[in-house]
Each structure stands twice: as structure tokens, then as C-alpha cells.
């Protein structure tokens, strides 16, 4: 069968495991945004730590079907891009991994604009915004055009990382995205094991 007519053409071994299906939202409930007074951009340390552990766990668990070169990490803010690139390099150094065997941080971690026109097998999206004040909103994270670009870069799996209690205040995220994804409640603490970070899976409505 052709890829168009065969529904299994886009099925991958990791889709059968909690947290790695085709559409997933990781709820980093303890995540907290930080705004740089100089750049006015935002970052989120908890999300950054989780994203790095997530991509390395995926590659380690499914070595035969996941290539780090085919993974992309998209960030909604430039400061988060810088933070994630730093964490990626730190992870390689801490684990004493040969950096020559892995793609550069610049090539896999980019802003929404940096990924426009590209496609990766697995895409992790760091939404960044996380604040207890509902009136503050989530800024241009709710911009439909940027969301469209970010959410259409994945060929097999789209893994969204964010703070649900903040994002669901946005009509676009709350009604269109989060309610239609598998939600994994996850601990963002970088000291926890990969298995401990996966949390509890809750089935949401399908498309």
C-alpha cells in the first residue's frame, strides 16, 4: 500500500508507549517562566531540563528507530533556545558522551521561525509561558500562525511541553490543542529518573 492509503505508514514502535504517541502534552505543573529584563524574552528552566531528558530518553529507549538528527526541539522564545542549547551541551558533557556523534545544539534546537519549512520525525515544543496570574496571558504563544508552524513540523510525533494551568487560559490552546492530546502529568525535577518523570497518562478526546 502507498503511504497515503496505509494508516500504518506513519506508525512507529514508540507510539505504543506512554508519552511517545503521535500527539502528547506534558504538563509541567511546577514550571515557572522567567523574563529577562534586558531582552524581555522568556525562559523556563523546568521545561528546559525536561525537554533535554525527554529527547535523550527517546533515543536511548528506541535506538533502532530514532535518530537524534531527526529530532527537533522548537522554542517559542529566543531565551529558551539559548537555555536549551546550554542544557544540551551540559548533558553531553555530564554523561561523557562524544559530542562528535551527536548533532550540534544549533541544528536541533531552534525558534519557531528557525524551523519554518523544515520537518523532523519527532518534534518537542517548549511553550515556555507559565505564570499563576491568569490575567497575564501567554503572549504570542497563542498566535495562530506561530502555532500552526510549530505544530506542523513533526512527521511522526508531536510532543508539547508546557504548564497546562497557564496554557488553558488561552482559548486557542485550551479548546483546540490540550483537550485533543494525550496528557502526561510529569515531574520537571531534573534529579528524578526518566521513568519517574513520565507520570500518569490520561486519555483525552481524539481528533
Question: What is the role of each PLM region?
Answer:
Residues 131-135:
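Cytochrome P450 core scaffold surrounding the K-helix E-X-X-R motif
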Residues 30-31, 78-80, 114-116, 129-130, ...:
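Short, glycine-/Ser/Thr-/acidic-enriched flexible segments
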Residues 56-109:
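Conserved helicase motor "Helicase C" RecA-like lobe of SF1/SF2 P-loop NTPases
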Residues 9-12, 57-60, 108-111, 144-147:
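Eukaryotic intrinsically disordered and solvent-exposed regulatory patches
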Residues 49-53, 78, 82, 86, ...:
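Feature representing long, continuous alpha-helical segments
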Residues 136-158:
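Conserved SF2 helicase motif VI
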Residues 1-57, 118-120, 151-154, 160-207:
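Helicase-core coupling region on the C-terminal RecA-like lobe
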Residues 110, 114-130, 149, 157-161:
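A short beta-strand element within the Helicase C-terminal
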Amino acid at each position: 500500500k502507498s503511504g497515503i492509503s496505509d494508516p500504518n505508514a506513519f506508525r512507529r514502535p514508540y507510539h505504543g508507549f506512554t508519552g511517545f504517541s503521535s500527539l502528547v502534552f506534558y504538563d509541567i505543573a511546577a514550571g515557572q517562566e522567567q523574563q529577562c529584563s534586558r531582552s524581555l524574552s522568556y525562559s523556563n528552566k523546568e521545561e528546559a531540563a525536561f525537554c533535554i531528558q525527554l529527547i535523550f530518553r527517546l533515543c536511548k529507549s528506541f535506538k533502532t528507530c530514532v535518530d537524534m538528527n531527526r529530532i527537533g526541539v522548537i522554542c517559542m522564545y529566543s531565551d529558551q533556545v539559548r537555555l536549551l542549547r546550554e542544557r544540551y551541551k551540559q548533558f553531553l558533557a555530564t554523561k561523557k558522551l562524544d559530542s562528535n556523534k551527536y548533532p550540534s545544539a544549533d541544528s536541533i534546537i531552534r525558534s519557531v521561525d528557525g524551523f519554518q519549512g523544515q520537518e523532523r520525525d519527532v518534534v518537542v515544543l517548549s511553550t515556555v509561558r507559565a505564570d499563576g496570574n491568569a490575567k497575564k496571558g501567554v503572549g504570542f504563544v497563542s498566535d495562530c500562525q506561530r502555532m500552526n508552524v510549530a505544530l506542523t513540523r513533526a512527521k511522526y510525533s508531536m510532543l508539547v511541553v508546557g504548564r497546562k494551568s497557564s496554557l488553558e487560559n488561552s482559548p486557542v490552546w485550551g479548546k483546540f490543542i490540550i483537550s485533543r492530546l494525550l496528557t502526561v502529568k510529569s515531574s520537571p525535577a531534573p534529579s528524578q529518573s526518566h521513568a519517574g518523570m513520565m507520570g500518569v497518562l490520561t486519555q483525552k478526546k481524539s481528533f
